[in-house]
A protein has these predicted regions:
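Central hydrophobic cores of alpha-helical transmembrane segments
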Residues: 313-324
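Membrane-interface transmembrane-helix boundary segments in multi-pass integral membrane proteins
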Residues: 201-205, 271-292, 311, 339-366
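Long, contiguous internal "core" modules enriched in hydrophobic/ aromatic residues
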Residues: 7-29, 120-291, 381
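Hydrophobic cores of alpha-helical transmembrane segments in multi-pass inner/ER membrane proteins
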Residues: 53-61, 89-95, 133-145, 207-222, ...
Length: 387
C-alpha cells in the first residue's frame, strides 16, 4: 500500500464508492420509472468515464514511446486509469439489455420500414453489437493489463527488459487504439442515427478522449502534488509541458470538429446534414455556443500565455473547464438523437454520471495506491529529473 498516497487521500475513495452506489441505486429506480431515459443516461455516463480511461491509455503509450518530461509525474495516474478498463467492460453490460430503447436497427419494425437499415443489418444487429463490444473491451483490457504488469516488473528490477517490452508494444497499441475506437463508436454513438455517417467522427472521439484523460490527470496532479512525493518531481516545466499538450489537443479537437461540420454542411446531403440539424435545433444551439467557447476559444486564447501554462492553479482551472466541456460534448452527441427540438435534462443523466464515476474513482484510487507514485528503476526517469 502506498502510505504517501493513502495519507493524502484518506477515506475519500470510500466516500466516492458510497456515493456512486447510492447514485446507481437511483439509476435502478430510473430503470423502472422510465427505462428509455435510463439507457440514454447510462450510455452517456459510461462513455464519459470510458473516454477518460481510453484517453489515459493512449497518453500512457505515447509517453512510453517518447519519454517526454510531461509523463513522469503523471505516469502512475495514467496507468491507474487504464487499468480500470476491465471494470468499464463490466459496467457496459447493462447496455446490452436496452438496445431496443437506443438504436433503431435493434427495432424490427423500424428495420422493416427502412431500406438503409436493411442494407446495414448484417453489421448493425444486436448479436454483432455484443460480440464486437466484448472483443474490443478484451483488446483494451489486455493492453492495459500488460502495460501495468510490465511497469510493475520494471519497478522490481534494474533490468530494462520490461521497459523494452512496453516500448515494443506501445507502438502497435497506438495503432490499435484509434482502429478499435472507430468500430466501437460507430456502433455506440453514430448508429444512434444509423442513416448518418462521418469518416472524421472516430478520430474526433479519440482526440476528445485523450483530452479528457489529460485534463483529468492535471486536476489530480494539482490536488495531489503538494500532498505527496510528487512535489519533488513536479515543477513549472512539467506543468508547462502539460499545458502545451492541452493547447495542442484543444486545437486538434477544434480543427476536426470544424472540418467535419464544414464538409457535411457544404455537402448538404440529407443523411449527413440531419445529424447537425438535430443538434442546433431549438435550445440546442446554446450548447453549441457553450462548446465553442469553453471547449476551444476560451482555453485556446488563455493557453497562449506562457505564464498560464507554468502556473499550477491556472492550468488546473483550464483543465477543469475543458474536462467539464468534454462531458457536455459527450452529452450533446447522444441526447439530441432522442430529443431533437431542444435541450432535455433528466436527473438520470446526473445519477448515471455520478454512479459510474463514483465506482470508477474508487477502483482508480485503489490502482493508484498499489504502486509508488513515481516510477522506480527506469533509467530515463533518473535522467529526466537531473536534466
Amino acid at each position: 500500500m502506498n502510505q504517501d498516497l493513502r495519507s493524502a487521500i484518506g477515506n475519500r475513495h470510500w466516500i466516492a464508492l458510497c456515493l456512486g452506489l447510492v447514485a446507481l441505486g437511483l439509476c435502478l429506480l430510473g430503470w423502472f420509472l422510465d427505462p428509455r431515459q435510463f439507457f440514454i443516461a447510462y450510455l452517456f455516463g459510461e462513455l464519459v468515464w470510458l473516454g477518460v480511461a481510453l484517453g489515459s491509455m493512449g497518453f500512457l503509450m505515447m509517453h512510453y514511446l517518447t519519454g517526454g518530461m510531461w509523463g513522469w509525474p503523471t505516469r502512475r495516474m495514467l496507468e491507474a486509469a487504464s487499468k480500470t478498463l476491465p471494470l468499464l467492460g463490466l459496467t457496459f453490460i447493462p447496455i446490452f439489455f436496452g438496445l431496443h430503447y437506443l438504436y433503431p436497427w435493434a427495432m424490427p419494425v423500424q428495420v422493416a420500414a427502412d431500406q438503409v437499415l436493411q442494407h446495414k443489418h448484417p453489421y448493425l444487429s444486436p448479436f454483432w453489437f455484443v460480440v464486437k463490444a466484448c472483443i474490443f473491451f478484451a483488446i483494451w483490457s489486455v493492453i492495459a493489463v500488460l502495460l501495468n504488469r510490465w511497469s510493475r516488473q520494471q519497478d522490481s528490477t534494474h533490468d530494462v527488459a520490461p521497459l523494452i517490452r512496453i516500448r515494443k508494444w506501445s507502438g502497435p497499441g497506438l495503432v490499435l487504439y484509434p482502429l478499435t475506437v472507430t468500430f466501437t463508436y460507430v456502433d455506440w454513438i453514430m448508429s444512434l442515427e444509423p442513416d448518418w455517417y462521418s469518416t472524421m467522427f472516430p478520430i474526433l472521439i479519440c482526440i476528445g478522449q485523450m483530452l479528457s484523460g489529460l485534463t483529468f490527470v492535471i486536476l489530480l496532479l494539482f490536488w495531489l502534488g503538494p500532498r505527496s512525493s510528487l512535489s519533488a518531481v513536479t515543477g513549472k516545466e512539467n506543468f508547462h509541458h502539460l499545458g502545451s499538450l492541452v493547447f495542442a489537443f484543444t486545437m486538434m479537437w477544434a480543427y476536426l470538429a470544424f472540418g467535419q461540420l464544414l464538409i457535411i454542411w457544404s455537402g448538404d446531403l440529407p443523411h449527413e446534414i440531419s445529424w447537425y440539424l438535430h443538434r442546433v435545433a431549438g435550445s440546442w444551439h446554446a450548447v453549441v455556443a457553450f462548446l465553442v467557447l469553453f471547449h476551444f476559444f476560451g482555453p485556446f486564447l488563455i493557453l497562449l500565455s506562457r505564464q498560464v501554462k507554468r502556473s499550477r492553479r491556472a492550468l488546473a482551472i483550464i483543465a477543469g473547464v475543458v474536462f467539464a466541456a468534454h462531458i457536455v460534448d459527450v452529452w450533446w452527441m447522444i441526447e439530441p438523437s432522442f430529443y431533437q427540438h431542444g435541450i432535455h435534462i433528466s436527473w438520470q443523466n446526473f445519477t448515471a454520471l455520478l454512479g459510474i464515476g463514483g465506482v470508477w474513482l474508487f477502483f482508480f484510487t485503489r490502482n493508484l495506491e498499489s504502486k509508488s507514485l513515481v516510477p522506480l528503476n527506469d533509467p530515463r526517469f533518473a535522467l529526466a529529473i537531473t536534466a
